Structure formats: structure tokens, C-alpha cells
């Protein structure tokens, strides 16, 4: 059984599984209205961070683990060792500690945005031929 079907089956009506394609703006709007996002794909987790939504990552690839680590969190499990009861427990914990988790998400997101801005400045400096771009 695909993992999304198992999640939906175990959590019932409190879960919506998105199966169609959406424009980025639509997806951000949908995610922004969620209490918690359970994501397998990297971009769903990135969108949750952008929209200040607590996330639970289920890893299928090391990049998901790396992103969750950069957010000060860990992926709950991998798609290969998924256990529905762990997700239910984590889901409840995230809802219970939502505000504290949101603070962590915002803090780590802001750190990543700062790194992105620095990279942008460095690239711009290289393109403009600046001799000294780092101190």
C-alpha cells in the first residue's frame, strides 16, 4: 500500500492527501492553511517552512534528511521503514507543541534565508568582477 494511502487510512478525516498538480502560488496557499504538513517530497517541506507551518518529514532521499537537519529537526522515518503508529504519535506531539515548533521553524528558516542572501551577494560580486568578495 502506498505510504499516502496508509497515512490517510490511519489518520482518517483529519488528513487530506493532495494528488493533483498545483501552481506554486496555489500550493503555498494550500500549505499555509494547514495545521501540520506531513511531507515526503523536499519541496513540500520547503513550502511548509516558507509558510510557517510545522512539518513532519518522511525521508525518501538524503536531501530530505539534510533539509530537516537544517531546520533543527529530524525526519520521522524513511519511506522504507514507515510505521503508521509513529506518525500518529508524532502528529499529536506536533499539534500539542505547535507554537514551540513554529519558533524553531522560523529561526532556522531565517538562518537559511541569510545564507541564501549571502550566496546571492557573493555570486553578484563574482559576476561584477569584484576582486575581494569575502573577508
Give residue spans per PLM region.
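Active-site anion-handling motifs in enzyme catalytic cores
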Residues: 1-135
